[in-house]
């Protein structure tokens, strides 16, 4: 019955209800959440938690993109699985433009920035129109694509970037945990 209304906003609301109604003391809830996020962000292999997919296994600690420019305002943009959520009405309402269109708009409207688009490691070996359209964004000035199989350290990228942009993925809340400014575009489970 809980999952009867399966929209993302409902899931976010249910998570908040569970959090608020739990008998666990608030300080313990925060301590548990902080511990989980700290392990997720700081355990580069993420092998200590069987519930976390091993997306960082190949990443080299503190490796940054070769194109990194200290003299620019650097934006780390983390792509979500558009093909999984793209047809959900709630997602369409909260994000009327695709991630590709959004990146195009940002890069054309704001000069003197570098955008580092991290394609999710889960999308490696996916020959999909969406992934290919993301790769094509490298033709734009100031847009740098980090391929799924790249050894660039995603969490270090978060730490050194000036701004994090997320399309509803957990990277948004992870970056907020690192005290980074975060712009989340579209709906998310952590609203």
Residue ranges and their predicted role:
Residues 78-80, 118-122, 146-148, 166-168, ...:
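Generic beta-strand/beta-sheet core signal
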Residues 37-134:
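Conserved catalytic-core segment of nucleotide-activated headgroup transferases in glycan assembly
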Residues 1-55:
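Active-site-proximal region of nucleotide-activated glycan assembly enzymes
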Residues 111, 139, 176:
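Anion (oxyanion) recognition and catalysis
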Residues 89, 139, 156:
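Short, basic, glycine/proline-bearing loop/turn elements
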